[in-house]
């Protein structure tokens, strides 16, 4: 089973059409990876599906980097 970091990066790569090798933990979805507002919504939905969690809108707005997504998933993933 992949760890959370690998799973988050795989989702980001699939959703944003970027190579996993180009995704760094500090990468900003918008500034570094070229996401627009629709991309970020779809990314949050994909993370919710992958990890079986719900991310409230006010929390989703705070997730702007790969590391923040990893941290959120780590803290909220259902075992």
Curated annotation (Swiss-Prot):
The modification O-(pantetheine 4'-phosphoryl)serine is found at residue 37. It is found in: Cytoplasm. GO terms for molecular function: acyl binding; acyl carrier activity. PROSITE patterns: CARRIER, PHOSPHOPANTETHEINE. The keyword Protein biosynthesis does not apply. Transmembrane segments: none annotated. InterPro entries: ACP, ACP-like_sf, PP-bd_ACP, Ppantetheine_attach_site. Residues 2-77 form the Carrier domain. Coiled coil: none annotated. Pathway: Lipid metabolism; fatty acid biosynthesis. Keywords: Cytoplasm, Fatty acid biosynthesis, Fatty acid metabolism, Lipid biosynthesis, Lipid metabolism, Phosphopantetheine, Phosphoprotein. The keyword Lipid biosynthesis applies. 4'-phosphopantetheine is transferred from CoA to a specific serine of apo-ACP by AcpS. This modification is essential for activity because fatty acids are bound in thioester linkage to the sulfhydryl of the prosthetic group. GO terms for biological process: lipid A biosynthetic process. GO terms for cellular component: cytosol; membrane. Carrier of the growing fatty acid chain in fatty acid biosynthesis. Belongs to the acyl carrier protein (ACP) family. NCBIfam families: acyl_carrier, PRK00982.1-2, PRK00982.1-3, PRK00982.1-4, PRK00982.1-5. This is Acyl carrier protein. It comes from Cupriavidus necator (strain ATCC 17699 / DSM 428 / KCTC 22496 / NCIMB 10442 / H16 / Stanier 337).
